[in-house]
Amino acid sequence: MKHFTIKELCRSDTARRLGIDNTPPASAVKALHELVDHVLDPLREAWGGPIHVNSGYRCHELNRLVGGTPYSQHQRGEAADITVGSPTRNRRLLALIKRLDLPVDQCIDEKGCRWIHVSHRAGHNRRLYMKF
C-alpha cells in the first residue's frame, strides 16, 4: 500500500456523525490491501496525481444507512468509490482504468461520473463496466 491507508479506506463522515463503529474485520482489511495493491495504487501511479476515496469499507449498519445494496462489496472491503474532482476528470480516470485493463470486478460510472465505483476480489474478476 503505497498511496492509500486503511484509515482512509474506512473513513466515513456518516459513521462518525451517527456514532457507528466502522472498524473492519481482518478479512476486510486483507481485501482492502488487495484492492489497493491490484487496482488503486497502480491507478494512482498511472494517473500521476491524488485520487480521493469517497467511500471504501462499510460495516453492515453503515451500508444500510447510506442506501447500499445488501450484497455490496463495500461490506467485504472489496470496493471503493473514488473521484479526482469533477465528472470531466472522472471520465478521464475511467478511460484510464479501461486502458490499463486493471483487474476490476466491477467498474461503475455513478450518477453521470460524479464518482467511480471500483471493486476487486480474490480469484476471478469479471471486469464488468457499467453506468448507474
Model-predicted segments: where are they?
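Extracytoplasmic cell-surface/polysaccharide-interacting catalytic and binding patches
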Residues: 1-44, 131-132
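Surface-exposed loop/turn and secondary-structure junction residues enriched for glycine/proline
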Residues: 12, 21-23, 60, 65, ...
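Generic detector of short, locally flexible boundary/turn motifs and exposed helical patches
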Residues: 16-21, 46-50, 81-85
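N-terminal start-of-chain detector that recognizes signal peptides
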Residues: 24-26, 52-57, 88-92
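Amphipathic alpha-helical interface surfaces
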Residues: 32-39, 49, 62, 78, ...
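Extended, low-complexity, intrinsically disordered C-terminal regulatory tails
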Residues: 37-67
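Catalytic cores and adjacent binding grooves of peptidoglycan-active enzymes
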Residues: 71, 75-76, 80, 84-132
